[in-house]
Amino acid sequence: MKIINSMKKHYKLRRFLKYAKIGGGFSLCAQSNCFADKKGLITIGNNCEIFGTLYSMENGKITIGDYTEIRENSFIGSVDEIKIGSYVIISNNIKIYDNNNHPTDPKIRKEMCKNGFYGDAWRWNHSEHARVIIEDNVWIGERSTILKGVTIGEGSIVGCNSVVTKDVPPYSIVAGNPAKVVKLIEH
């Protein structure tokens, strides 16, 4: 089993190197993944651990600062721009999208179903999108979702199972669906 996991990690590293600019001290696991329509749209800082999936479609940029961790089964999908600062902890099973993932127009959705999953209508650029910014020293709790157009301020915490639909002020704790400020953090 160790040999198989080692082979998977080597294969995944090659995929990351194909699509991303990676800083020193990079770590991944057998479940790590990286996909992009174009090379060079994903940038990963120094001493990062990426145990989830990064997905850039069209011209979607993903930038990750230094000493940031993205844990298992997390998915970051961009068609616009997602900026993640340094010293950020993204827990397990997190979803971060800078887009609606599917168009809201019923005619386009009907076309999607008629033409199958790999048709052009399934591309994220057909859905509404807006950049996501996660500032430095943020902790995102397990099973949370961050939606398009959101900025999470420096030093903030997103509680487990939260759905973040609006900006989070710096040094605050948010929780719930939709996420609301439940406490301020002294700093």
Label the predicted regions.
Residues 139, 145-147, 165:
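Short Gly/Pro-enriched loop/turn and capping motifs at secondary-structure junctions
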Residues 157-163:
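A generic "structured core" feature
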